[in-house]
Amino acid sequence: MERRTVLITGCSQGGIGSALAEVFHQRGFHVFATARKTEKMKHLRDLDRMTLIPLDVTQESQISAAVELIQKHTGGTLDYLVNNAGDGYIIPVLDCDQLHGRQIFEVNFWGPLRMIQEFSPLLIAARGTIVNINSVASETLPLWLGIYSSSKAALLALSETLRLELKPFGVQVLSVMTGAVQTMIFQTNYRLPPDSAYMTWEKQIAAQAEGSEKASRMSATVYAERVVGDILNRQGGITYRGQMASFAYWVVALMPRFLRATPLLAQVGSQ
């Protein structure tokens, strides 16, 4: 029996991708772990069945090189593609730097699309599965995350369309709506632009950006174990994992949008 294969983007130490790589490895997979810089994956280097690949999902040449490498290794198949690499951006929409905002979409939306397009022949050959790591923010639309939430909402729409378009080829598409998870992606010394109209709320926004707000978070390892279980046992669709993810599901499913906005408005008041 041939060993199953998985490619995971964004596997820098301390993040979700790294935890996913370790859990897949424990399940007996050959893991192709990627990050912009391989030194950020040195904790994975000595594991057998673990191939580290330098990959920036915004660079088509690096994606093409990864396709060629994996084709040679597997004979032209890939069982699972996990699009995990992503960037956050906590900023009031009025203060958004548009170049930075476009870069968020390059990583969070166009990056996964590039990966899917380039690896589709390998996935179709294996009748494989595409997994897009998304966020409950794409549905709950929290304050100060307008650009990030928009990029993830676009990814969700793309995933649901792909789920239908790829079904004739036997390829499954799974979206993982992620709640709060303990990672190392937070910013430090957060500051709003000096002319921001939101200076009254800078301390509150900074706490969110720096991860110092009093919110409970699921460990990345527990999250990864549950997500890998979903990946191996589901036939595509949408799953919710991470702290408060199930709560977010029920809020979106049962609560009218105008009621969902009420607690958000309470955070900023009205003028």
Swiss-Prot record:
Source taxon at top rank: Eukaryota
Which pathway does this polypeptide act in? Secondary metabolite biosynthesis
According to its UniProt record, which residues of this chain constitute the active site? Y148, K152
Q: What class of enzyme is it?
A: oxidoreductase
> Where, by residue number, does NADP(+) bind?
I8, T34, K40, D56, N84, Y148, K152, V181, T183
Q: Name one GO cellular component term.
A: endoplasmic reticulum
Family annotation (Pfam families): adh_short
Q: Keywords in UniProt for this one? A: NADP, Oxidoreductase
Enzyme Commission code(s) on record: 1.1.1.-
Q: Which PANTHER family does the entry mention?
A: NADPH-DEPENDENT 1-ACYLDIHYDROXYACETONE PHOSPHATE REDUCTASE
Q: What does this protein do?
A: Short-chain dehydrogenase; part of the gene cluster that mediates the biosynthesis of the indole diterpenes penitrems. The geranylgeranyl diphosphate (GGPP) synthase penG catalyzes the first step in penitrem biosynthesis via conversion of farnesyl pyrophosphate and isopentyl pyrophosphate into geranylgeranyl pyrophosphate (GGPP). Condensation of indole-3-glycerol phosphate with GGPP by the prenyl transferase penC then forms 3-geranylgeranylindole (3-GGI).
What family is this protein classified in?
Belongs to the short-chain dehydrogenases/reductases (SDR) family.
Name this protein carries in UniProt: Short-chain dehydrogenase PC-15
